[in-house]
Amino acid sequence: MAYHSGYGAHGSKHRARAAPDPPPLFDDTSGGYSSQPGGYPAPGADVAFNVNHLLGDPMANMAMAYGSSIASHGKDMMNKELHRFVSVNKLKYFFAVDTAYVAKKLGLLVFPYTHQNWEVQYSRDVPLPPRQDLNAPDLYIPTMAFITYVLLAGMALGIQKRFSPEVLGLCASTALVWVVMEVLALLLGIYLATVRSDLSTFHLLAYSGYKYVGMILSVLTGLLFGSDGYYVALAWTSSALMYFIVRSLRTAALGPDSMGGPAPRQRLQLYLTLGAAAFQPLIIYWLTFHLVR
């Protein structure tokens, strides 16, 4: 995959007309949030000093700008490839979200312990879209969280004077590869355990992608409060994600159709769910520990 950089190049008079892009799969609701300049209270406070230091570092700003271009380019390419090989109508279900759903789902990912009903809701044997059912998996939050993770990784590398396009590209590709490997392992486990469920590859991709939310919170806390804050946030987000994965996958994989099966098969299904949950903290730590020093 080749990235075309425009740094230092003079604009040409004749530009090749690019082919029109396919329509986006979803509306980006993140545009409503804009950064506000200045206005940090208590200049002597530690948190304010850290925030000023992060935002005022020119290397960090350059890294974030480059990371933004990589994330935008990757998002456009993903949309084009998905339009070529995937049923867009089926995929749109996972992007049928609104602001209220996103806010509630983020809260559920951070603190899932008080949530009671984990059943996915149906209407005439058709699952309700995410904006109508908090338990429905979505791909909007994982996609936006991955882009945010790339931007945050670029800023962290810039602060540590370790930023380079190659390092940031390796960081982004590694995060994607781990999720793909996790989904493939889950598909293999479901096949070997002969689990009868409605889980598709998109469902597994959504559940695997929710870890990016915990990764963002861990890295951001580490940048603001140091390594101690990082490990506290890592422990909290990992525990919350493990609980969320166990309850969500157990409800989906161990549905009513599988409850009447043999006991060994039920144990295999339970082990598969617990194994998927236990693997989450290891991936989060592996993808974030080098960004906090």
Swiss-Prot record:
Name recorded for this polypeptide: Protein YIF1A
Residues with the Phosphoserine modification: S12
Taxonomic source organism: Bos taurus
Role played: Possible role in transport between endoplasmic reticulum and Golgi.
Annotated keywords: Acetylation, Endoplasmic reticulum, ER-Golgi transport, Golgi apparatus, Membrane, Phosphoprotein, Protein transport, Transmembrane, Transmembrane helix, Transport
Regions that span the bilayer: 139-159, 175-195, 203-225, 230-249, 272-292
Biological-process GO terms, alphabetical: endoplasmic reticulum to Golgi vesicle-mediated transport; protein transport
Region (Disordered): 1-37
Residue list for modification N-acetylalanine: A2
Family (UniProt): Belongs to the YIF1 family.
Membrane topology: Multi-pass membrane protein
Assembly, per entry: Interacts with YIPF5.
GO cellular component: COPII-coated ER to Golgi transport vesicle; endoplasmic reticulum membrane; endoplasmic reticulum-Golgi intermediate compartment; endoplasmic reticulum-Golgi intermediate compartment membrane; Golgi membrane
Top-level lineage group: Eukaryota
Segments in the Lumenal topological domain: 160-174, 226-229
Location relative to the cell: Endoplasmic reticulum membrane; Golgi apparatus membrane; Endoplasmic reticulum-Golgi intermediate compartment membrane
Cytoplasmic-side segments: 2-138, 196-202, 250-271
